[in-house]
């Protein structure tokens, strides 16, 4: 990735040297049979306030519906690294392979079926640099349920907790702290040494809106339907997060 000047709408700490503002970033996306979601994730990446020239998009695809045909036409636009596996792998192993393939010094997760804020990359990089940590994420998540169009907030759990979709980190950390390759969910537990690794918290509104739909690998309806002190229904509406009507219409009934 070549160096390029650029600006972001996020206010950067004045103490940071300008040459450190835009380290090369790899956006990481493991995907499995999510063809209908990927065009909207592309829109989320296009909307990022971080300089496009300083980002690449690394996709690991082990679905039975190969999405190579969807991604090849935009390979140049997104500085794409596409990895195809004919064998379905556990999510822990997929994360590890994405980490190895990434060329950026900072790795930012964007899962295939969620909505990401335009400040997602910029805020993650800013926090990593300003806090001088190797790992950032959010223990609070905002969830949109497509079945009843309600928005909930879950968390916080603890200061070092974060879900993988919210996390960003240095490549050095990722390579030296692999996920358990045998796990099919909750891979962040092994990645963070059971949440003992220091993690700087991000504002969840600057990260993502978790889309809870019928195809989720883990049914998030369990979070909503089981009484919990960390799960709260909000009065927020989808338009508070997604301003573009066409995109909002898709996610509202995804």
Identify what each model region corresponds to.
Residues 107:
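Short aromatic/hydrophobic "clamp" motif used to bind/position activated sugar donors
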Residues 111-116:
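The conserved acidic donor/metal-binding loop of glycosyltransferases
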Residues 42-84:
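Acidic donor-binding segment of Leloir-type glycosyltransferases
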Residues 2-47:
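N-proximal low-complexity "stem/linker" segments adjacent to membrane-targeting elements
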Residues 183-191:
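Acidic donor-binding loop at a coil-to-helix junction in glycosyltransferase catalytic cores
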Residues 23-26, 56, 190:
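Cell-envelope/extracellular polymer assembly enzymes that use nucleotide-activated donors
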Residues 85-102:
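Glycine-rich, basic loop-to-helix element that forms the pyrophosphate-binding segment
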Residues 119-151:
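Conserved donor NDP-sugar-binding/catalytic core segment of glycosyltransferases
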């Amino acid at each position: 990735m070549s160096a390029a000047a650029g600006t972001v709408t996020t206010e950067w700490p004045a103490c940071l040297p300008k040459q450190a503002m835009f380290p090369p970033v790899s956006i990481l996306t493991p995907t499995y049979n999510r063809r209908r979601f990927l065009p909207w994730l592309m829109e989320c990446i296009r909307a990022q306030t971080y300089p496009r020239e300083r980002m690449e998009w690394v996709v690991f695809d082990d679905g039975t519906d190969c999405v190579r045909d969807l991604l090849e036409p935009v390979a140049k636009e997104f500085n794409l690294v596409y990895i195809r596996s004919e064998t379905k792998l556990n999510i822990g192993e997929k994360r590890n392979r994405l980490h190895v393939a990434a060329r950026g010094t900072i790795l930012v997760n964007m899962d295939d079926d969620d909505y990401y804020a335009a400040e997602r990359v910029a805020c993650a990089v800013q926090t990593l640099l300003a806090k001088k940590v190797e790992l950032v994420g959010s223990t609070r998540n905002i969830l949109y349920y497509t079945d009843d169009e309600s928005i909930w907030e879950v968390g916080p759990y603890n200061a070092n907790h974060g879900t993988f979709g919210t996390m960003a980190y240095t490549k050095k950390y990722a390579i030296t702290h692999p996920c358990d390759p045998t796990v099919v969910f909750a891979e962040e537990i092994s990645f963070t040494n059971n949440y003992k690794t220091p993690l700087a918290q991000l504002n969840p509104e600057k990260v993502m809106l978790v889309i809870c739909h019928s195809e989720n690998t883990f049914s998030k309806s369990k979070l909503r339907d089981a009484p919990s002190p960390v799960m709260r229904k909000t009065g927020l509406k989808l338009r508070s997060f997604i301003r573009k009507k066409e995109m909002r219409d898709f996610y509202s009934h995804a």
